[in-house]
Amino acid sequence: MNRPPRLLLNLARPWGEADPTTLAERAVGLGFHGVGLADSSRLMPDCWVESERVLAGTSAALAGPVVASLGVRHPATVAGALRTLEDHHPGRVFAVVGRGESSVHNEGLPVPSLRSHTDHLRTLRDRLLDGDGTHRLPGRLLGAASGPRTITATADALGGVLLDVGTELGTVRRAVALARADHPDTQVWLFVRALVVNDPRDAAPAAAPLLGSCAARMVAAPAWFGLDEEQLSLARQVAVRHDYLQHGVAHATTDVDDEGARLVRDRFLLVAPDGEVTRRTSSLTGLGIDGLVVAGGLPAVVPGLPALAAALRAGVAHAVPTEESR
C-alpha cells in the first residue's frame, strides 16, 4: 500500500432528509476523500443523478454509487452511466456494485444467483474497457461481497472488492487474504458501520437500525463468520426483525438489546468511544485495506460526523501495514 487508506462516507439519507451535496462538502471538510450514494429508489434520491450533482458541485475527490444494484439495473446501463460520469469528471468517479438484495427484495424481483451475478460483473468490466484494453475506472470500481464464494468471484471478475464482513479482526483478515489469493493486486476496501458514542451504554440504541441486515449476512454464511449453533440461532432471531422496506435507515430493526443483538453488534459494528474507534480502525486498516466506506445510514452519524471523522482519520494515520497484508 503506497498511501494511507482512503475514507469515503456513504450517504444513505431518505428522501427530503438532507441534500447530498451539502453533506458531501461537509464530509470532505472533515477529512473524508469523498462520498458514496446509496442505490435504493424507494427510499432515497437516485444515486446517479446525485452522483453528478456531488461531482459537479463539490470538491470531493471521489464520488459515485455505493452500492449500485445489478439485480435491478442492467450492467450495460450501469457501464454507460459510469462512462458518462467519468467523461465529465475524469479520475473522480468511484463505484461499487452488488446484487442489491434490499432493492431487489423491495421490487419483488428474484435475487440473482452467484453465477448470474458474476456474469453481470464481467459484462460490466468488459463494457468499461477502451479499445486498447485500458480500464476507464482503474482501481475505482469494486464489487460488494460478504461470503467467501462471492468474494472470490468478485475479485476474479472485477479486480476490486468492497468487503462487507463486519469488524471482527479474524474475519476481516481471512476476507482480505481470500480476495487477494489469486489476484494479489486486487483493490480491497472495507465497509464499516461506525459511530462514536461518549457512553458505551449508548451503543445499543445507536446501532439498532442496522443489526438485522448484518445478522442476515451472518446467517447466510455461519461457518465463514465462525458461528456455533447457539450463535447461529441468536443471529437468526435478529435477522427476522429486519424490515427491508426501511433498509439502511432509522427503524429498520426493532430496538431490542438482547444477547443476539449484542453478538451481531460486537461482530459487525464499530460503535464505541472515540479512542476505541481509533484503535480498532488502526488494526483493521493495518491488514492491507485500501480504503474504508463508512455507513451513513445510522441516524446519529450526521450529527456525530466531526467526532467520527477525527477518530477514523487518527486510526488510518496510525495503520502500519505489513508486507504479508499486501
Where are these regions (language model features)?
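Acidic (Asp/Glu)-rich catalytic clusters
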Residues: 2, 24-29, 51-62, 82-93, ...
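Alpha-helix-loop-beta-strand connector modules within alpha/beta enzyme cores
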Residues: 2-3, 45-68, 72, 117-130, ...
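Short, acidic/polar
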Residues: 15-27, 77-81, 144-153, 206-211, ...
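N-terminal beta1-alpha1-beta2 module of alpha/beta enzyme domains
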Residues: 1-62, 66, 325
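Flexible, glycine-rich active-site loops centered on histidine and acidic residues
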Residues: 2, 6-14, 72-134, 165-176, ...
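An alpha-helical appendage that flanks or caps ligand/catalytic pockets
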Residues: 108-132, 181-283, 320-325
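Hydrophobic faces of well-ordered beta-strands that scaffold small-molecule active sites
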Residues: 5-11, 35-37, 62-68, 93-97, ...
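Active-site-adjacent beta->alpha loops and helix N-cap segments on the catalytic face
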Residues: 43-53, 114-115, 165-182, 300-306
